[in-house]
Design a protein with these regions (language model features):
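A glycine-rich helix N-cap at a beta->alpha junction
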Residues: 236-260
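Short gly/ser/thr-rich secondary-structure transition/capping motifs
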Residues: 25, 108-113, 268-271
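A conserved beta-strand/loop element that lines the FAD pocket in flavoprotein oxidoreductases
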Residues: 81-91, 253-269
Length: 272
């Protein structure tokens, strides 16, 4: 038997990883690398692709394509000796039942070949790495297909790029455009991605020499700029220490970006 961070693995253990994003993919890769071959590593994910989420920002401004930020999971996991099931987890049963003595997860396949099929996947150890749920429904009018765009997934980011190009076309014809970028709910905590995106949008506008036709505004539930969901931080460079509040404000002032802070979005209306 071996121990993995104080967890005892007996012969032929089944380690089930839920999720194949940054956390799940990393966990399964290291588990397969570290564990002897008799132990089985299983990954369950509803998606057929792995995507590098931070690069969605560049998809959203046309600097990368969808296929540059994703790859198929099945071929890689087959090469690595990882059992891959394209399915969504429906329920977790840590105590098992009358049929399965160990814990198991009920899954529903999402692949074209097995779509809708239900299976019970036993496990000896479970890694929960499913990530966050995109809760656009929490704010009326928020989300793709409604009154905003998003860069939360590669498909969302591709749509954002399409909409951004439409704005560029209007600006090139002399029509002013307003851009409102930030967090979409009073309790949102991922301001960093929106901050990256607003600066990239500003860069693309300036690259096209259209900045005089653009009004860019940052909206966030942060108490102060630069909180980034963690109460701010400090940056040391060139012998100076600067707070992220000053850092962020300086970036925005330099680029003429307006800001609205301590604001929780509760509704997004069309054409506003």
């Amino acid at each position: 038997m071996i121990y993995l961070h104080n967890i005892k693995l007996t012969a032929m253990s089944k380690i089930l990883v839920l999720g194949a994003g940054i956390a799940g993919h990393t966990a399964s890769a290291y588990l397969r690398k570290w564990l002897p071959g008799e132990h089985e590593v299983i990954v369950v994910s509803p998606n057929s692709y792995y995507q590098w989420i931070p690069s969605n920002i560049w998809v959203g401004v046309g600097r990368m394509t969808i296929d540059q930020v994703r790859f198929k999971l099945a071929p890689l996991y087959k090469k690595w000796g990882i059992v891959y099931k394209q399915a969504r987890a429906v329920s977790v049963h840590p105590e098992g039942d009358s049929e399965i003595q160990s814990g198991y997860v009920t899954i529903e396949y999402t692949s074209d070949e097995q779509k809708g099929q239900i299976e019970k996947v036993p496990f000896d150890f479970l890694v929960n790495a499913i990530g966050p749920k995109l809760n656009f429904e929490a704010t009326e009018g928020l989300g793709p297909g409604k009154n905003t765009v998003s860069v939360c997934t590669y498909s969302h980011a591709a749509e954002a790029w399409e909409k951004l190009q439409q704005c560029f076309s209007k600006m090139q014809k002399g029509e002013k455009q307003k851009f409102l970028i930030g967090t979409g709910h009073p309790t949102a905590t991922c301001q960093g991605a929106a901050f990256e995106y607003i600066l990239n949008v500003d860069y693309e506008i300036r690259k096209r020499k259209l900045e005089n036709l653009a009004e860019i505004t940052w909206i966030s539930n942060e108490y102060e700029l630069g909180d980034f969901g963690m109460g701010g931080a400090f940056i040391k460079k060139g012998g100076y220490v600067t707070s992220t509040k000053v850092f962020t404000e300086s970036f925005f002032v330099q680029r003429g970006i307006r800001w609205i802070k301590q604001a929780g979005v509760i509704k997004v209306e069309p054409g506003v």
